[in-house]
Amino acid sequence: MKTKLILTIFLSIITILGKAQSRYSIIYEKQLGQNFAGENSNAVFHLLDYADSLLMPKQIIKAENIFAIVINPIFRFSKLFLSNYLITDYIMTMNHERFGHGYRMLEAGGSIDKIVYNMPPPFTNEFSYINATYPVNFTIQQELMYRLGGSETNLVLTDVMRKNILLDERFNYNFGLAYLYGSNDMPGYTAFVTNPAADPIQYRQNINQLYGSEPLARDKMKAYSFIALFTDPMNFYALKSVFYDYIIKGRHSSKIGMIKLSNRLKYLPRFRFEYTPYGPELVYQNYFKLDYKLIQFSFSHSDAALPDSWRVLANIWNIKLSNQISLNLSGQIWDQPNIEFYQNDKLITSEGFGVQFISTVNYDISKDKNLYGFTLQAGYKSTGYAVGEQLNKGLIIRGGLTFKLGNKSL
């Protein structure tokens, strides 16, 4: 009874405090890490989406006849293939290489030698890749971080993207291919790529080496991958926004659906797995839309064949403090097995409980047709693994500009 009362009061407070507002941020942080890349990449996609809504026609034949039914979808498909596909692949691939693998190597004290970008099929059949120089002191778990970093950074990017899409409850087609690439970078790569040098295969071999046995078989990881691919409803909405709503119907965006629990409360579950330096964690994400608020609760745990680990995470977006000031809150607590890594040639060991909390303050200057303002993120993380953050403990400080430009055509 007491728990229900506390929950009711809590939900009432966050409901009263204003209206949801998706926003895009151009931020800076000292280490130029994965959150820096994720926020700024989403801002780039928003700018491209806004320019597309103003400048690109959805049809070249205005009359409603058989020619329009055939020609207009061909025009839209050609535009998608020759611009969206190539631009999206470049942004997401370079994010994977530079701010994924590259960031984790720089964090370990190594250096980036070169990054080679190869265009996607059918233009080439070669993978893009990064060459790096390893530091003298480098643990196997830092090797695991380097291997998982590419897919990890695209999880960070699509977490930001998903948050904005759910706040608006609309999926603009210009984000569709990016979401499919980023959110499925880890499960898709794991399920379908068989090259022995591929990151998931190297990761699995490193985990088995770490524990001196074979707790991770390829068939098990493929099973987790297919579950993740087919239990994310956002994959369906991304495909629909691109191939049905845009190409066939000529729409700029489409409404997404959530499970209606009441007149005020909606719900969207999804499953994914995350690679960590101690093995994959299975993650159960739950998004709640309460009136105009978005809340996320997640729980994750290790595979049964690996050392025990668990994590509880909560995010709340858009707590309105005044007409101009809003607040986002993020926190997580975990229990992790042993992690060893070098920093500045000093061996650091972490095991057991850890926490991370971040508060984001948004100050809006203008809220007419377009939104402009400032954002500041401040928080703390203890030593241990959290997606997108450094391994070592320390303060988290990020800041920059926020904006949202109104689309001309929807």
Summary of predicted features, one role per range:
Residues L166-G176, Y244-Y267, K289-I295, I319-L327, ...:
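Short loop/turn motifs that connect adjacent beta-strands in outer-membrane beta-barrel proteins
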Residues Q21-I91, G109, K114-M119:
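Auxiliary, metal-adjacent structural segments of Zn-dependent hydrolase domains
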Residues D185-D303:
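C-terminal membrane-associated helical module and adjoining short loops/tails
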Residues F10-K19, Q332-W334:
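Hydrophobic h-region of N-terminal signal peptides that target proteins for export
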Residues R23-G38, N125-D232:
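Metalloprotease/metallohydrolase-associated module, dominated by Zn2+-dependent proteases
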Residues L82-N137:
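Small-residue-rich helix-interface/hinge motifs
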Residues P120-N131, H301-G399:
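Outer-membrane beta-barrel translocator/channel fold
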Residues P280-F288, A314, S359, L391-L410:
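Outer-membrane beta-barrel "beta-signal"
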